[in-house]
């Protein structure tokens, strides 16, 4: 099975959907942040492993606690996944915190700060220009 095959893409989507449902409804671990979402899933072509990219809304401690909770719940999730999805092999789940959303938010804040600085500078230039027009 090729990495980008249609079948592999469908399996990735199905595993992501099933895990999202399981994490939100079945897990009762207090370490897992309720604002945890699965960003992407990459199931290996041999169906032995699956990298599960998660995003956790919160501070770094919350991310670490959520990751620890998910790692300890991985065998349970794998068993539930085997019941929910009919696959030849049920993949071993490897959870990875995805920083791309936080990176995007921080870049957006930086862009907004730069734009706000440009607006202030252009406002100051306009007021300076008006002052010079009054002198003429």
Curated annotation (Swiss-Prot):
Keywords: Cytoplasm, Ribosome biogenesis. One of its GO terms (biological process) is maturation of SSU-rRNA. The keyword Protein biosynthesis does not apply. Pfam families: RBFA. The keyword Cytoplasm applies. It comes from the Bacteria. SUPFAM superfamilies: Ribosome-binding factor A, RbfA. InterPro entries: KH_dom-like_a/b (IPR015946), RbfA (IPR000238), RbfA_dom_sf (IPR023799), Ribosome-bd_factorA_CS (IPR020053). GO terms for molecular function: ribosomal small subunit binding. Residues 116-136 are annotated as: Disordered. One of its GO terms (cellular component) is cytosol. It is found in: Cytoplasm. One of several proteins that assist in the late maturation steps of the functional core of the 30S ribosomal subunit. Associates with free 30S ribosomal subunits (but not with 30S subunits that are part of 70S ribosomes or polysomes). Required for efficient processing of 16S rRNA. May interact with the 5'-terminal helix region of 16S rRNA. Monomer. Binds 30S ribosomal subunits, but not 50S ribosomal subunits or 70S ribosomes. Belongs to the RbfA family. This is Ribosome-binding factor A. It comes from Lachnoclostridium phytofermentans (strain ATCC 700394 / DSM 18823 / ISDg) (Clostridium phytofermentans).
């Amino acid at each position: 099975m090729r990495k980008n095959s249609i079948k592999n893409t469908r399996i990735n989507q199905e595993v992501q959907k099933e895990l999202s449902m399981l994490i939100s409804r079945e897990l009762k671990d207090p370490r897992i942040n309720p604002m945890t979402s699965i960003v992407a899933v990459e199931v290996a072509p041999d169906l032995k492993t699956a990298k599960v990219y998660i995003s956790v809304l919160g501070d770094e401690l919350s991310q670490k606690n959520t990751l620890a909770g998910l790692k300890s719940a991985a065998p349970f999730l794998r068993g539930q996944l085997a019941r929910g999805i009919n696959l030849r092999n049920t993949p071993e789940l490897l959870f990875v915190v995805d920083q791309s959303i936080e990176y995007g938010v921080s870049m957006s804040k930086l862009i907004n700060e730069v734009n706000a600085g440009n607006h202030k500078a252009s406002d100051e230039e306009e007021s300076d220009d008006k002052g010079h027009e009054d002198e003429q």
